[in-house]
Amino acid sequence: METVTICASINEKKKAEFFQTMESLTGLVESQCNDLDIRVKDDNSLIIKITFAGKDQMEKNFYTGEFNILKGSVKSLCENVIIKVNESLLNNN
């Protein structure tokens, strides 16, 4: 099991755009992983947990397509973005 965790703070001015983007991407991302959990707290803090069956599934999907759009959207619409794979900080956030 491989788990990717994305933590960030949603920019208040871009909150509506963030939710629209997540709504359009969720189904596509869910089809390429075992589980997708997106949580937003009242203070606009965001935690996205993406679980893959194994390293092969993660490498096949997380570095291409919809996941690149997801990561790019989070990076452009949020602040203080941290991406971890199995609790290890991912290089080149």
What are these regions (language model features)?
Residues T26, I69-L70:
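A short hydrophobic/aromatic micro-motif that marks alpha-helical segments and, especially, helix-coil
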